[in-house]
Amino acid sequence: MKVVRSTCNYCSIACNFDFHVNDNGFIERVKPSEDYPVNQGFCCVKGLNLDKQNTIYENPVLPLIRKENGEFEHISWDEAFKVFADKVKKIQDKYGKESFAFLSTGQLLSEEMALAGHIGRNFLGGNGDGNTRLCMATAVVAYKQSFGFDAPPYTLDDLEHSDVMIFIGCNPIVAHPILWSRVAKNENKNKKVIVIDPRKSETAVRADMWIDIKPKSDIRLLYTLANVLIEKGWIDEEFIKNSTEDFEGFKNHVKNYDINDVEEYTGISKGKVLELAEIIHKGEKVSLWWTMGVNQGFQAVRTAQAIINIALMTGNIGRPGTGANSITGQCNAMGSRIFSNTTGLYGGGEYSDVKRRKAIAEILEIDEELLPKKPTKPYNEIVDGINKVLNGTTNMNELNNKLALY
């Protein structure tokens, strides 16, 4: 029996486990790693069932190629690489470099994403995107527009230091149990947990305050809340002056969101909004958290920006226990965003950034001209490009049959 340490592949928390593997290669026991700083010996029920993923290959893993009769047969790796390379070259010679595209996922390792992006984008000059664009584009755009860089500014430890935690459109008790365990470890007896969600979720049940807004009214609530904080002077003027830009523009914009109208649009009473504003004001370390309820919602990017702006104008960022914090879903969605070479340069940065382009080219030891000069076509356009008259009922198998190589 040997013990192999590895990372859970179910969600973005990335818990570590000790897998007890017998001589036949089967996992007999799964135990969360006690000395790993992320899960600290805890896990959810999904992690405890990782042994159910056991896959034993009796024969060497070889590529399969479809024969003319429609059946698959094994071929060698060398032959598979040659067939693939030859077909890609013929397609690009006939239709141009952008006729090639790849689709990836947040389930890949960062190194695999980087390699796919290196080959597909740098050397083949094609398009490529991941399904992480479909779920996380809201947060990506909001962070880039607010900070100039896509990087959620938090660690799980912040949950143990916050005295006010506001969860917007997320249900961590179910979706991110280990993240919620850090809330439970917070020893501040006066801490406040607030949930903004139309649903009375499991997290809402456990919250000190549940704000059951009407669907599509997040942005109205957040702008009204921001206006209240500004009017009452419950903002960090020094931080705003030293660390932000165009606060006056935001201030003038949210003036249009009168608290006397808030109940009509959101279903939340004036008194409750004032109470929330006061809780934020009195909190020394306020953190705001969101996930798919915002990212897949109405006016999603603006909603995420409003969350970030509330954190900025109250000075709740850049300190332990604070932050405007987007929670990802897939186990390596963040790796896809940073290292896939699809919407920006490796490690972050725009394709138009001359200094960054030069630095990346030197690291990769390639000609700078090989680096893309613009972002890829997005996931949906790649799929739509297979069939210009695509409609919602078109089956993916029908689309695949239209491809010269799939």
Show which residues each predicted segment covers.
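N-terminal export/assembly segments and adjacent metallocofactor-ligating motifs
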Residues: 1-232, 243, 269, 346, ...
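N-terminal leader/propeptide and maturation segments of large enzyme subunits in energy/redox metabolism
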Residues: 68-74, 232-270, 346-392
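Glycine-rich phosphate/diphosphate-binding loops that line cofactor/substrate pockets in enzymes
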Residues: 80-100, 155-163, 253, 274-287, ...
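Flexible, glycine/charged-enriched surface loops at secondary-structure junctions
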Residues: 95-99, 235-240, 287, 318-325
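Conserved short loop/turn motifs at secondary-structure junctions
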Residues: 101-109, 265-268, 291-298, 330
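Glycine-rich anion-binding loop/nest that anchors nucleotide
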Residues: 163-188, 290-291, 374, 386-394, ...
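A glycine-rich, hydrophobic/aromatic-adjacent loop/helix-cap motif
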Residues: 281-403
